[in-house]
């Protein structure tokens, strides 16, 4: 199998809702419950000190729930949230619809320092609608010790066939070690973003040039079956409920031979204070 792994660019984006009715002295921020967003919350005191009289309220949710609630709120002009973390997929479309305020910064924020791809991806009609907290792509994280023991290596551009072979070689269910961990929890913010990039590498696409759905194509059938088989044979039990945080806990406990997910995970899996296998993760 020579389907090459493709990269999905992503980010945590701070955007301001145009429909939010800010109560005097309060800002409500909706964000995802990953480590870096939790760290961001620790800066609340600095903001409130510099802006006396403004209190920041945080609504922290898992990724799937966050996307559902934010999308519903902003589309219906509910006004629950003033500031929110969204992705590059949503920012330009929502901005063009007038759902987000365009952002204008003072001289202390160097907009020109933003990577062009990030800035362009967050803009519509020449206006910037969100500011990146970080930018990321996806990558393979793997246990060097397990791969070495299996007599294998990880090339710079692995195919899905190689990933499958490596997962099989590293799986040791008797000792609670599974060759690969992938998001299995249903949802755009969970398994579907990953599955879309996997399907692309199999030649699948959501629509053709005339916007006709292509989900019943042989390429989609191949990709979905490959994904299911990979997790069924070499993934941990309960994969259908796993998203980023669940898999992070598994890999840090040494339960996963390999994980394909956001590059933001690197700072956690390589941290000896968080991961039991930090010294053997590549």
Language-model features: locations:
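Short helix-initiation/N-cap motifs at beta->coil->alpha
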Residues: 61-69, 89, 158-165, 238-252
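Short, solvent-exposed loop/beta-turn-alpha elements that line the ligand-binding surface or hinge
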Residues: 101-116, 156, 184-187, 202-222, ...
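Extracytoplasmic/periplasmic solute-binding protein
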Residues: 129-133, 138, 162-212, 256
